[in-house]
Design a protein with these regions (language model features):
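Glycine- and acidic-rich phosphate- and metal-coordinating loops
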Residues: 91-100
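Divalent-metal-activated hydrolytic enzyme cores
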Residues: 34, 111-178
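Short glycine/proline-enriched loop/turn "hinge" motifs that connect secondary-structure elements
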Residues: 84-89
Length: 178
């Protein structure tokens, strides 16, 4: 059984487009300062504001979406309650994977995409965009939107690396902190 999604299948799924992908990538990068291999999953409210996010290191080379889904579900459950009680999902999950290698699609990306889609179904979220972050820059799979910065080689400012909130940014809160 192959638990992976090809780019064409992803594009046909009707994943909602990011209104401002550059801002989403910059914000997630600034909040989590990912370096390879790190995944950042975020849940967005209908108004486009980030509700919760989590980042975690992952084992490279995994091409089975089952493992990726389990990791995503584990981290989503820690930062935001499920929305399974709703008839339709209102929050959208976005996944940014910071990895080594070329910026093009890989079978690992396919496993992440399958995992994101399934984790969203099981957590009551809409499946949102899948973004890769490499040394070449970022790329939103299925949308053909990309940029050079931030990238996997981009170093954070000293105050951000210290763990202090950056001026003008709200610290990330889990949904239970409300």
């Amino acid at each position: 059984v192959t638990r992976t999604v090809e780019p064409a299948e992803w594009a046909d799924m009707g994943v909602p487009l990011l209104a401002s992908p550059r801002e989403v990538v910059k914000d997630l990068h600034a909040r989590h300062l990912p370096s390879p291999p790190t995944a950042v999953v975020a849940a967005y409210d209908p108004d486009g504001r980030i509700r919760a996010s989590a980042s975690f290191a992952f084992r490279a080379g995994v091409v089975d979406g089952w493992e990726r889904r389990n990791a995503l579900l584990s981290h989503l459950r820690r930062v935001i309650p499920h929305d399974l009680r709703l008839r339709r999902p209102v929050r959208t999950a976005v996944l940014m994977v910071c990895r080594d290698g070329a910026s093009g699609w890989t079978s690992e990306d396919g496993a992440w995409m399958w995992g994101l889609r399934d984790a969203c179904t099981l957590h009551g979220l809409r499946c949102g965009s899948y973004v890769t972050l490499t040394r070449d820059g970022w790329h939103v799979v299925g949308e053909n939107r990309a940029g050079r910065t931030p990238n996997a080689a981009h170093h954070a400012p000293a105050d951000a690396a210290s763990g202090q909130p950056q001026p003008g940014r709200q610290p990330i809160r889990s949904a239970s902190a409300r």
